[in-house]
Curated annotation (Swiss-Prot):
Residues that hold Zn(2+) according to the record: 83, 180, 208
Catalytic function, reaction form: D-tagatofuranose 1,6-bisphosphate = D-glyceraldehyde 3-phosphate + dihydroxyacetone phosphate
InterPro entries assigned: Aldolase_TIM, Class_II_FBP_aldolase, FBA_II, TagBP_ald_KbaY/GatY, TagBP_aldolase_GatY
Any one of the GO BP annotations: galactitol catabolic process
Highest taxon in the source lineage: Bacteria
Protein family: Belongs to the class II fructose-bisphosphate aldolase family. TagBP aldolase GatY subfamily.
Cofactor-binding details, from the entry: Binds 1 zinc ion per subunit.
UniProt cross-references to PROSITE patterns, sorted A to Z: ALDOLASE_CLASS_II_1, ALDOLASE_CLASS_II_2
Protein name: D-tagatose-1,6-bisphosphate aldolase subunit GatY
Amino acid sequence: MYVVSTKQMLNNAQRGGYAVPAFNIHNLETMQVVVETAANLHAPVIIAGTPGTFTHAGTENLLALVSAMAKHYHHPLAIHLDHHTKFDDIAQKVRSGVRSVMIDASHLPFAQNISRVKEVVDFCHRFDVSVEAELGQLGGQEDDVQVNEADAFYTNPAQAREFAEATGIDSLAVAIGTAHGMYASAPALDFSRLENIRQWVNLPLVLHGASGLSTKDIQQTIKLGICKINVATELKNAFSQALKNYLTEHPEATDPRDYLQSAKSAMRDVVSKVIADCGCEGRA
């Protein structure tokens, strides 16, 4: 079985002191880059998609691609629902074969967040599907969900324990100063808060908004308990900029098998760097 849940991946990372990167993909080419690079480096990775990605590519198509590529490379892969908010949508995708879910109800008041997440956990655990949830809110935009920086708030360590115990989640996404998108200047991450959360919660912790973070910051968060690192914008930027550059330099290009190669190469460099930063090479 090559398509797996993230639970064992993240538990192994927690014990081993490294992190598993979750790369947001959008199509065949971006998935090829992630899987081929991970297989070459023998690194565990998570293939993540927002609701918009699953709508764009099709749930059955993405599942078929992940399954086929995992078997081809003899490399275990997890396909993960990133920032999904609707129970019915999650349930449908789980029944289709998805084995890892993030239910994002972080915009709701604390008690309602617990209630919404627990409903998803109770359903997903019947299918051996791992569940991630978020406490606190990141600024920036992910798919159609936009959070003003002024409305973002950090995870409360004591609430984090209550939240984890009340919901039964398998991993917890925390807000410690990162944001979705790229940073205009280096963010000031609250490492002390992360250390306190780690003392209150023994679950694998997840860091969203890692695009553009320094190697030093990523590795410090891993030392303090982060087991999953989410990267999306940095991949899109590398891919799209290289594609634009190629087409500008080669306006006669019409064959996507040719003009997509430079985009894939640029994205591959980012994937390789993130795997190195996470310390997960050779851990698959």
